[in-house]
Amino acid sequence: MLKTSNLISSLLHNNLKNTSILRNKSIFYYSTNSNNNNNNNNNNNNNNNNNKNINLQNIKGTYDLFPNEQRIHKFIFDVGRGVAERYGFKEISTPIIEPFELFNRSVGESSDIVMKEMFKFKDYSNESSSPPSMICLRPEGTAGVIRAIINQSSTNHLTPAQRYYYQGPMFRYERPQRGRQRQFHQLGVELIGDQHPRSDVEIIDMAMNFIERLGINKSDTLLKINSLGDTDSIKVYNETLKRFYNDNVNKLSPISIKRLERGNSLRILDSKERQDIELNKLAPSIQDSLSIQCKDRFNNVLKGLDCLGISYEIDKSLVRGLDYYRHTIFEIQIIDNNQNNKGQRQQQQQQQGLAILGGGRYDGLANQLGYKYKEILPSIGWASGIERMVLFLDQSKIPNSIRPIGIAITDSSLSENAFKLCSNLRRNGWSSTLSTFNLEDENLSKQLKKFKNNPSFVIILAPSEYSNNTVIIKNMDDTTQSIIPLNEIDNFLENNKVLKN
């Protein structure tokens, strides 16, 4: 690659017209359109005006997480991490960028995600690939975890079963709305290598445990569950549905007519179009297409839920939106039990039936993506969207972030001592901060004013006290003050239940 200075020099020397130069054959481009020197001069003169018109707003469907929002997200992730590790799961992390074909094969080329919601682009980094291969921003986490396992499966035959959890951003080109963004965050779990019905029960139990530990009442949620059966059962049901929808094609929405033409009738059951919802009430039940073995398996899952006292509702229309699901599928939905506040009731009715967590079994997905060590690799998992979960949390019960300890002085001669004390406190595990680095130019009242809404305590260094190796500690909540020896600061903070970082 040419050095930047040589590149610019070459462009200027040759006065290239309408040139677009690819940098590293990747995403970054340098372009110029130099018709004559007058145009260049005009462009230079207009630089200031152009800068005034620059719009650097967030990209639609994305948002910034400031400290309070981070606090809420961190709470959800921390609860999820704690629950996952109590069930023996370990954290895994996969790239945000993945091959497009990974999701085309796993999620399904006829799915809404692949057809309408993927952020995909050409990968020019592989010069041997012609035409360039397609890569994408991941729309969900399961396929990436399976891909990672396949990549290292030559030394790991997944015995015993593997348990992973993950968290991070996902991307879908959807219409942004409350609780749904184009960049969103998920927490998910995957149990890979066990096909016993009790593994389904454990995964669902884990999901319910997660919801409860977030502080969401059981009475406000509904577990919906269904079985799609195995691959043969799904083929039989898909043909049954196809006949039903062909007989009622005039009642389908335009988008579902296209789904029918593509041959995936199951997607119509997942439609949110009003006319499709009405027609789906009359659709054949998948239970009639299940083999005896699939029915027995599903009944064993339900018995396991009964054993653990987990309430559920069998929803025969539940199919989930991804092609890789087999056998058990489930969702945890928010239901409206608030009959007191009319405004809250109206808002909750709009969110009635909104899924805050969903998952299911995806036996054979790994084999579909290249896993060779078992005929069918059994797997099951779930994922929860964090942005949607936030809507239903009682944020007053979420722990506050650690409040730092403030350091202030009454005399400029103590500024170096304050700086050193702040550093020592941090090394001892305390969160601490100065009101300003320019302590010499601020009186005590200005310093305390800056600390008003954050630190729980402020340590004040004053000449008379400091000469006796003591400091003043001010409680910013009740304004009381104490004089404490320097070597007793740690004990004082611990006794007052100040949290370490």
From Swiss-Prot:
Low complexity: compositionally biased ranges: 33-54
Reaction(s) catalysed by this chain's protein: tRNA(His) + L-histidine + ATP = L-histidyl-tRNA(His) + AMP + diphosphate + H(+)
One Pfam family in the UniProt entry: HGTP_anticodon
Keyword Ligase: yes
Enzyme category, top tier: ligase
UniProt KW keywords: Aminoacyl-tRNA synthetase, ATP-binding, Ligase, Mitochondrion, Nucleotide-binding, Protein biosynthesis, Transit peptide
GO MF annotation terms: ATP binding; histidine-tRNA ligase activity
Location relative to the cell: Mitochondrion matrix
GO cellular component terms, A-Z: mitochondrial matrix
Family the UniProt entry places it in: Belongs to the class-II aminoacyl-tRNA synthetase family.
Protein name: Probable histidine--tRNA ligase, mitochondrial
Protein's gene: mhisS
